[in-house]
Amino acid sequence: TAGYEDEPSHTVTTVIVPHNAKSGQLVNYLAYIDSNGAQCAPSYSMRQGSKFLNDDLLNYQQLLFSTFLNEGWILTIPDYQGPQRAFAAGRLEGRMSLDGIRAALNFGEIGLEKNTSVVTYGYSGGAIASGWTAALQASYAPEINAIGFAMGGTPANVTSTVQSLDKGVFSGLCVAGITGIIYAYQVVQDWFQNHLYPKGNDAIEYARSHCITDIFSRYPFSHVFSDDFFRNGSSILYDPTIQSVISDIVLGLKESETPKAPVYMFHSQHDEIVPFSDARKTSHNWAKHGADVFFQEFSDLPIGHALSEITNIPNSLFFVRDRFAGKPFPKGYTRKVTGNGLEEPNASLAGLGELVRAIQDIQGREVGPADSELKQFILDRN
């Protein structure tokens, strides 16, 4: 793959082929990593024996990708932050994601054709990658047969996201985001060398070796943008060097970066982590530039960042299912407000069943034919 400045780079993608795999259908699943430790990448955290198999965030995400596997869809789950573990560096993440799709299509043993239909899904930090996959696909990987992009709780503007998180319970995300941007851009890394105070340097070093739950617990209610962490800490986001980078990773600003396939976005109006207004602005800009966008808002007060995804599993599933089925998608811009994802008429019963099955998956429900294929293989050999 390639870094932000087109320098050669590399990463890993994990491909999961279900027992009932459907040919010609691939889901590009972008897990939220939201941290900078090498061990936090999906290719590490999903390995048998990894302590992160007991991690709540990973198990929570398995709700959805287990559901996708039950549908028979092959998954590619890339380490889209790359070797620099560059969380929040959207353009780089988009490239890594697209090259992960290319790798899956090119790996003959999986049996995917070059014209395989691909749908991308990402939530929260994964939505940064999903959004930039959508924005860059037409120019960076036009040969990919992308038929849909789904994203929720989308941090469309990194600047306003970290500003809203600073001094709050999730301020550790500020540390992780800054660390990711530093290691994605050499110009930012050079700039920070002259602006780091010991506390800031310690925070970045900690983030580079830990995952998000540890970062959350170490830096709650921290005033990251202060002179405790950085020289002129309150104004670093407005420094010309930093501005030149972060202003270029705002989703939806450039008409040339408009998704060519249908886009489904969902977001709580009361999201306490990612600003709702930024995602809505991106949806408007994309539609203004010619994209077909369905933007779903959740108005129930208890539906914040975490509950938005879990209650919307049925609608996310139906979006992917409908894209593979070739069903029509609304043209232009569509906005829909519901209390929560389960209030959709088509999600109330069928969707609730999917949600129950998804929860059963992470509680240990058996998926697939167990060892029947292995037994048959042994019989055949004998």
From Swiss-Prot:
Disulfide bridge map: 40-211
GO BP of this protein: lipid catabolic process
Top-level taxon in the UniProt lineage: Eukaryota
UniProt keyword annotations, A-Z: Disulfide bond, Glycoprotein, Hydrolase, Lipid degradation, Lipid metabolism, Secreted, Virulence
Record: glycosylation sites: 115, 157, 232, 346
Top class in the EC scheme: hydrolase
One GO cellular component, as annotated: extracellular region
Single Gene Ontology MF annotation: triacylglycerol lipase activity
EC number: 3.1.1.-, 3.1.1.3
InterPro entries per UniProt: AB_hydrolase_fold (IPR029058), Lipase_secreted (IPR005152)
Protein name according to UniProt: Secreted triacylglycerol lipase LIP5
Protein species of origin: Malassezia furfur (Pityriasis versicolor infection agent)
